[in-house]
Every structure is written in structure tokens, then in C-alpha cells.
Amino acid sequence: MTNIHHHKILILDFGSQYTQLIARRVREIGVYCELWAWDVTEEQIREFNPTGIILSGGPESTTEANSPRAPEYVFNAGVPVLGICYGMQTMAMQLGGLTETSTHREFGYAEVSLRNPTALFDHLNDDATTSQTTLDVWMSHGDKVTRLPDNFQITGMTSTCPIAAMSDESRRFYGVQFHPEVTHTKCGQKLLQNFVVDICGCETNWTAENIIEDAVARIKAQVGGDEVILGLSGGVDSSVTALLLHRAIGKNLHCVFVDNGLLRLNEGDQVMEMFGDKFGLNIIRVEAEDRFLEALKGIDEPEAKRKTIGKVFVDVFDDEAKKLTDVKWLAQGTIYPDVIESAASKTGKAHVIKSHHNVGGLPDYMKLGLVEPLRELFKDEVRKIGLALGLPAEMLNRHPFPGPGLGVRVLGEIKKEYCDLLRKADAIFIEELHKADWYYKVSQAFSVFLPVKSVGVMGDGRKYDWVISLRAVETIDFMTAHWANLPYDLLGKISNRIINEVNSISRVVYDISGKPPATIEWE
């Protein structure tokens, strides 16, 4: 079996908004990497034994006395090092160079003129349509390197930044003031590939097939012949987790699907058909709509609704788990960004905006071991694994759906009547987006039930009924988002269908709020 962790890159995070993007780009090349805080110890680096190290960008200034620094061992480990933006600046400072606050800050596109030859820039411009002497890049910096460390050479410059890239070829140390990880930088992925594959010598073994083989082997080694329980929601993470476990241990996997009454139209039946009938998984379906709605009576505050939904889910899951007396392990669809977020929260710097629906767990007395086969994977990698395991692309590429489901898309108190109306309206919205070839052009689209009544006219009579809001956004990372500029005729068609086909809806509105200041979900 291929050792997918034999060659690996360590990325030290100095706080850049793009740091996770660096890791995803390295993974796309086919090499495993991990993301650690900048203040890691020498012992931890030695234990990880990286094939190469990348220093990320960050918001701090190297001219400040207490700004973050890379561990000195990074430059004594005998492996190649690439510094990006702040990472280049701290490399220069720590190795004897000088950085200063620039009088001309660079944010956005810039043209880098290539200077002395460097392995980092080899064959970047194989495409004959691109220049052989310049690179179009994305800059985001206020400081700049003004004096090189000993044995370094300038490999790139801009009109306002004389040292935009540098290298010490003998020690295989490289720095770039721009961000190769963002798509705005042309040839950025090829630059990272030069570093990871050609300079560090990593083999590209991080593929979907190898990851599946490794995950199955590790599950077998971890749980042996024991039985495992998994909460299956039908979402991407739990679905891929279920199929990996099923491949590894077969009928020893018990999936519990809790139908809480807060799902999309016909979603419960679709989950059972997909995983029970098609894939042959052992699934227990729990009809718990009444239990959830009873617990949610009178609760209209969003955070209280989330907490209640989470608590009831744990209680329902606990009741089913008690019936399976031989279960020794709990499986969860934890993915790598969850691991990173959890680690970051321990620093005390995190500010809670909304509680995450996966936070929490089963009662302590259950004493189950934890199986998390996706904890090394980013979301896009999970989708690739799912595709390789046979899940349909349309399911894997569905828009995100919140853990509390319609519980955060019905504003205020949740009632069955409201959920039923919202389900039908949302199904029409999504159906029309598909028909108009707009579904995959937007990042997320959904309907929201507003518990306010508005006057309308139906035939010769007036009616006083509920309001539905449509929400569609375009985003790269879900940290910021723009409302989608859907065609007016499409919005009109959707509105007419909802008002005519869903009883008790008198008005449809379109949400044109960006993030920030609004969040994507209404609650």
C-alpha cells in the first residue's frame, strides 16, 4: 500500500486569510501537508519530519518587536523553505536581512519582473502566450524587504518593490512577496509545484484512490471486528464517512438517520433510497419530527433554537445507541477545517458568532471510542473521495445545508405549518434554478420563511398570508459573499410559481444583502 504521508509539507500559519488556501493548493498538487501555528516547537517539527516548510503570510508587521517569528529550527532543519509575503519578510529578518514599512503599499494586481534564475521560477511560462520575463501576481503587503540576507539573490522585482522575490539556491530558501496560492496570480500553482515537487522532491501520492485505500486500512486497524455507530444526515461529510466505514467493516456499521422534520422536501426518503437501497448500508430511520417540534415550542431566539435542536438530536441518538449494546465506536464526519478551527479556538482569540452544529457530542457515560476518517481532508477532497466511492455528483455538489436545517430558515418560533410551506417554496426555487442553468452558477441558494403576513389579491378577493424570502449568493470561501444577480424574468417565474402553488404565501421577496454586513443564513 502506498504511504501517502511519507512526503509531507509543513505550513506554518502567521495569520493570513489565505493560509488554508496554500494547504489546499499543495494537496491539489498531490502532496500531503499540515497547517500548524507559527510558534510550534523544534521537537514538534522534528517529530513531524517535513520534506519542506512553507511560511504563510500574515497581518502583522515584522518591524514590530513582538511580531511572530518562525522557530529558528526551520532554517536549520536541512529542508527547503518557502516564505510567502510575511513569511518572506520574517525569513529575511531572521537570516540577517532588513525589512521596512513601505511608503507605497501594494494591494491587488502587480507585475513582477524576473531577475536572476531560480529553481522556483523554472518553466513557469511554458505557455507561449505569456511573457517570459514577467509574472502577473497578487500582492497584499505594507512592509517590504530592503536588504537581502547573506547569500541571497533578487529573483523578482516590481516598480515599487525592489525585492519582490529572493532565493538562496544553495540552502534552498525562497521568498516571494506575492501570493502564489490565489487564483489571481498567474502560474501560481506551477510555482508551488516547482517548490513542492522539484525542489523538495515530494512524490505526488495524495490521490483519491490512495486516500481511500489508506482510510479503509486505518479504520480496519482501529476498530477491528467491533461495531460502529454513525449519525447519517445525508450531507456530504457524513455520507462519505458512511461509505468509507461500510467498505472497511460492512454490516458492523450501524447508521442512525434522524428525521427531525426540519429537512428539505422528500429528503428523508431520498437518504434511505440512496444509502439503504443503492449502497446496502445498515440504516435505522428515526421519525422524530414531533419530538423536535415539541421541544422547540415557544423558542424564537436563533441561538436557543440551535442549542435545542442539538440537544434533542443527542437525546434521540442516545436512545438509539442504547439499543445497540455491542457498539464500541462512534464515527463522525469531522473534516480538516473543523480540526483547524478547534485548535484555533483554544488560543482564546476566537469570537463566537454562531454555535457550530457539530459542536457537542454524546453523553460521557457512553464511553465510545471516536473514529474520524475524514479529519485530514478539506471539503473539496471529501467530494473527490465521495465521487470515487460512487456517490452521484449532483448530491456531492449540492449547496450547503445547515445542521439545524429549516430550524434556522424559519424565522422565530418553528411550527410544522411553517416548515411545510418553506419546504415546498424552497423546492420550487431550487427546481427553477436547475432548469435555468443557474444552480451551479451560484454558491448557495435557499428560501426563508418570514413569520409576518402581507396583504395580497387572489382573483376577486384579498388574502392576508405569509412571506417567503429568496436568498442566492456568490462566494469563494463563504467568509464574504455577494448577492447573486439573478435574471428578473427568472425571479418573476419563481415568485409566480410559489404564490400560485404554495397555499398561504402571498408575497415573495429577494434578499440583496451582502456578507458583510449580513450573514449568508438569516439566523
From Swiss-Prot:
EC number from the UniProt entry: 6.3.5.2
GMPS ATP-PPase domain sequence ranges: 206-398
Pfam families attached to this UniProt entry: GATase, GMP_synt_C, NAD_synthase
Record function comment: Catalyzes the synthesis of GMP from XMP.
Keywords: ATP-binding, Glutamine amidotransferase, GMP biosynthesis, Ligase, Nucleotide-binding, Purine biosynthesis
Recorded metabolic or biological pathway in which this protein acts: Purine metabolism; GMP biosynthesis; GMP from XMP (L-Gln route): step 1/1
Gene Ontology terms: cellular component: cytosol
Species: Histophilus somni (strain 129Pt)
Transmembrane segments: none
Catalytic residues in the record: C85 (nucleophile), H179, E181
Record-linked SUPFAM superfamilies: Adenine nucleotide alpha hydrolases-like (SSF52402), Class I glutamine amidotransferase-like (SSF52317), GMP synthetase C-terminal dimerisation domain (SSF54810)
Residue numbers binding ATP: S233, G234, G235, V236, D237, S238, S239
A GO term for molecular function: ATP binding
Location of the Glutamine amidotransferase type-1 domain: 8-205
Subunit structure: Homodimer.
Catalyzed chemical reaction(s): XMP + L-glutamine + ATP + H2O = GMP + L-glutamate + AMP + diphosphate + 2 H(+)
Identification of the protein by name: GMP synthase [glutamine-hydrolyzing]
